[in-house]
Amino acid sequence: MSKPPRDYARIGTNTYFVTASAWGHRSLFQSERIASLLINTLSHYRSAQKYLLHEFVIMPNHIHLMFTPSEITLERAMQFVKGGFSYRVKKELGIDAEVWARGYVDHRIRDQNDYERHLSYVRNNPVKAGLVKLAEEYPYSSAREGIELDPRPQGLKPRIMKTA
């Protein structure tokens, strides 16, 4: 009997913070055409209900996502994002080159405090990198207006407030 996927028991219930880098850490995503295509790809798979998309930022050489895969494993969701985007780059832009570095780094969001910490990191990444002064000014981020996102995941443990 084959071994179930790593996230089998928790499919559709875990929210992740994921970082994926461009091949060779090139600044591939600073191109407006490429960044827009990546946003379109993220939106496409969100609309196809492959995942709930909570936040994202596309930096010049990497991306950060906060999402909850729907009825699929994290690995499969990332295959949609990375593989789907690579296919579209080659087909629609005629760029026949490696797009992504192998793998990705993931962290399962554990509670509301963890969610807020990663949300702040995603939103402020372009500010911290000196690309903009305000997160809302960065064009390739869910912090700007007009980006359709899914609500905060349900079922996160409440934040524990420390009292004096």
What is each of the regions a protein language model found here?
Residues 1-164:
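Short catalytic/metal-binding and nucleic-acid-binding patches
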